[in-house]
Amino acid sequence: ITHYLTKMTEIAIKSGGTVDKYIGDAIMIFFGDPESRGIRDDALACVTMAFKMKKALNGLRKHWKKLGLAEPLDVRMGIHTDMCTVGNFGSVDRLDYTVIGNGVNLASRLESMADSNEILISENTFNLVKEGIDCNYFDEIIAKGKSHSIKTFQVAGIKSKQHSSKKIQASKNGFNLMIDKNKINDIDEIISLLEDGIEKL
């Protein structure tokens, strides 16, 4: 567990997250305080961090297997973006720098709902990260303190920057171009056709 928590904490800190607390074998992490890069970038950094953690765990499992630890360690991650209260809370004798609020409770609910070894995010977070993160619709939930259902999404992967735009379209008099990267099987053939067209001009 110490090996696992050490690796996950390292990823969290490098990603700009604040490690709030360890709860058994779980970690609570938040973004946006004491420093924020803006709500969108904070959300993207958090989801990217979770995906890095998921990949790192695969490497740890292989290492543990070599050591003879056959039982896999499964994880679930829940992420929600909301306004929360951050500060020092506790008693006169002991204070903890932590975050509280309904948003924290919803993130915990998402974690408990997530499939094994998956990342589940709220609609709030999805709307902030959908340009950079591939997600699949998962389910709707009724959260405590909310009068409406909340859509949830499962993280599928991080979109490559160079392939973020899948379609290229252009049209002028005597010229039409439409490229759909999702349907291309042989990129070299397409490049050859484009070069051919340029030569004929």
Spans of features found by a protein language model:
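Conserved NTP-handling cores and scaffolds of large molecular machines
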Residues: A12, L57-W64, E111-N117, I133, ...
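Intrinsically disordered, glycine/charged-rich C-terminal tails and inter-domain linkers
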Residues: D74, S116-L201
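Residue-level signature of catalytic and energy-coupling elements of molecular machines
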Residues: M8, G24, M53, I79, ...
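Short amphipathic alpha-helical segments
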Residues: T2-T6, A107, I191, E195-I198
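Active-site-proximal alpha-helical element of nucleotidyl cyclase-like catalytic domains
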Residues: I1-S15, K52
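Catalytic/regulatory signature loops of cyclic-dinucleotide turnover enzymes
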Residues: H80-T81, F89, N102-E123
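Catalytic core of nucleotidyl cyclases, primarily class III adenylyl/guanylyl cyclases
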Residues: I11-A45, G59-N102, N127-G132, I150-K151
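Helical mechanochemical/support elements of P-loop NTPase systems and associated helical scaffolds
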Residues: Y4, I23, I39-D42, M49, ...
